């Protein structure tokens, strides 16, 4: 296992404005509304990422396509750090305003949806999904559909997944971090296993359960319990560890220039500049491989005994 694979991405919160009203959205831990990250901070973030050879930068919000300069931002990042794996997470609201050149420059595109059912679309994200699906079809190989599983969409989940597969998209399923409804997760996992077979655990920066369909498209499940298999060095001695709903899946850079690896912002840096904060915090996000393998091997032993 390459330990570098376990280091999380640098996530740039480009703005805090969003067109959607998803009750489960954690807003990347941000409580400030209508704020945009200045280009100067974006530049510092990219410079730090290049210095540390961070493998992946993710653009998020809010809704990042609400940035009228999103094309310029993507171009800037790729010019300054061509080797970086650059992704964006969007609900597709203004995807039609994003240039083809930008879509080509992006290495990964994550489209967040809740359902294809009109009442649910109106309730949560208020986006005509036919538009982003049509735009992203030529980029299917680098597009993943993110779906948060809730009571509202669980009964139609397999049909939603299959429709995404029909477009050639991979699918990531997630669960509400705060509620962490074990009964819902168990019910959904049982249903998906009957349809797609047993899922295996894959160890990335966020551990996931994964299976493939007949066309070798990925179906990944991000469950809080599985994510917690991986404990980062910075978390081990943190007095707030028990209060975390999400174990670190990214180092977040916020529009006001503060940097934190956790949604609750308990862990911050004493450094002044954005650049120095990233250089200070990111190296602390490693994983104790002895701990990780110990957990995995204990799990294997318990399976043998049962």
Stretches found by the model and what they are:
Residues 2-40, 52, 261-262:
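Canonical Radical SAM [4Fe-4S] cluster-binding loop centered on the CxxxCxxC motif
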Residues 9, 13, 26, 58, ...:
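Conserved beta-strand segments that form the floor/walls of ligand-binding pockets within enzyme
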Residues 28-32, 116-118, 178:
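A short, flexible beta-alpha/helix-coil linker loop
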Residues 1-12, 21, 53, 209-210, ...:
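N-terminal [4Fe-4S]-dependent radical SAM core
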Residues 39-59, 67-174:
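Radical SAM/AdoMet-radical enzyme domain recognition
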Residues 154, 158-159, 163-259:
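A C-terminal junction/extension of Radical SAM enzymes
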Residues 229-306:
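Flexible mid-to-C-terminal extensions adjoining Fe-S/redox cofactors in radical SAM and related proteins
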